[in-house]
């Protein structure tokens, strides 16, 4: 049984004061999350502030990126050791914006996954196709290649500690969302590949999140799919009321 994970990626939004206000709003309305995990990933500058607020609460702390070395002359980089020191439990790796804007490739992303694991951080590996790739019928090929490139050479135990986030690039910040059926089909494919690499028993335990214009009005239908185990939420995580509605999604039996 996989525990749903609802993760908020704040991207390059929120000053420390704004971060405090948002977290206080989340904590005020969170209530009993039951069988769900809640995660927020603020910008680096707000990590300490958010850590101090969420410590001892159901909200976990994550970062949006990490470098591959524990320390050294890497100006502007943040190491996994530093993230652990700040209380982070998770880190996003390979987000489509890191791939497209900052030129990160599969080799570097794979190294970041390994660096996170080596320092007891849970990496959230992001994979997904662009609109031209999807229109050309290559979506599955692209996503499978990204998963394999990042995880090749890892042991089943290592792969079992990773979270995958499927984020169709064409849906991020556009208001467009993959239909629940389309998202489920890709999640099922990802789980099959994870099974090929780590065994079906391990694959069955791995959380595969959906990311791409997740909103309060589509979360219930997405979470009704058998292989969608949570969401990586962008814009809708920047307001307490919308993220809380996502956290408290209605499961099919409700």
Curated annotation (Swiss-Prot):
<dbReference type="GO" id="GO:0005829">
    <property type="term" value="C:cytosol"/>
</dbReference>
<dbReference type="GO" id="GO:0004807">
    <property type="term" value="F:triose-phosphate isomerase activity"/>
</dbReference>
<keyword id="KW-0324">Glycolysis</keyword>
<feature type="binding site">
    <location>
        <begin position="9"/>
        <end position="11"/>
    </location>
    <ligand>
        <name>substrate</name>
    </ligand>
</feature>
<comment type="subunit">
    <text>Homodimer.</text>
</comment>
<dbReference type="InterPro" id="IPR035990">
    <property type="entry name" value="TIM_sf"/>
</dbReference>
<dbReference type="Pfam" id="PF00121">
    <property type="entry name" value="TIM"/>
</dbReference>
<feature type="binding site">
    <location>
        <begin position="234"/>
        <end position="235"/>
    </location>
    <ligand>
        <name>substrate</name>
    </ligand>
</feature>
<feature type="active site" description="Proton acceptor">
    <location>
        <position position="167"/>
    </location>
</feature>
<dbReference type="InterPro" id="IPR020861">
    <property type="entry name" value="Triosephosphate_isomerase_AS"/>
</dbReference>
<dbReference type="InterPro" id="IPR013785">
    <property type="entry name" value="Aldolase_TIM"/>
</dbReference>
<dbReference type="GO" id="GO:0006096">
    <property type="term" value="P:glycolytic process"/>
</dbReference>
<dbReference type="InterPro" id="IPR000652">
    <property type="entry name" value="Triosephosphate_isomerase"/>
</dbReference>
<dbReference type="GO" id="GO:0019563">
    <property type="term" value="P:glycerol catabolic process"/>
</dbReference>
<comment type="function">
    <text>Involved in the gluconeogenesis. Catalyzes stereospecifically the conversion of dihydroxyacetone phosphate (DHAP) to D-glyceraldehyde-3-phosphate (G3P).</text>
</comment>
<dbReference type="InterPro" id="IPR022896">
    <property type="entry name" value="TrioseP_Isoase_bac/euk"/>
</dbReference>
<comment type="pathway">
    <text>Carbohydrate degradation; glycolysis; D-glyceraldehyde 3-phosphate from glycerone phosphate: step 1/1.</text>
</comment>
<feature type="binding site">
    <location>
        <position position="173"/>
    </location>
    <ligand>
        <name>substrate</name>
    </ligand>
</feature>
<dbReference type="GO" id="GO:0006094">
    <property type="term" value="P:gluconeogenesis"/>
</dbReference>
<feature type="binding site">
    <location>
        <position position="213"/>
    </location>
    <ligand>
        <name>substrate</name>
    </ligand>
</feature>
<feature type="active site" description="Electrophile">
    <location>
        <position position="95"/>
    </location>
</feature>
<keyword id="KW-0312">Gluconeogenesis</keyword>
<dbReference type="GO" id="GO:0046166">
    <property type="term" value="P:glyceraldehyde-3-phosphate biosynthetic process"/>
</dbReference>
<protein>
    <recommendedName>
        <fullName>Triosephosphate isomerase</fullName>
        <ecNumber>5.3.1.1</ecNumber>
    </recommendedName>
</protein>
<comment type="pathway">
    <text>Carbohydrate biosynthesis; gluconeogenesis.</text>
</comment>
<comment type="similarity">
    <text>Belongs to the triosephosphate isomerase family.</text>
</comment>
<keyword id="KW-0963">Cytoplasm</keyword>
<keyword id="KW-0413">Isomerase</keyword>
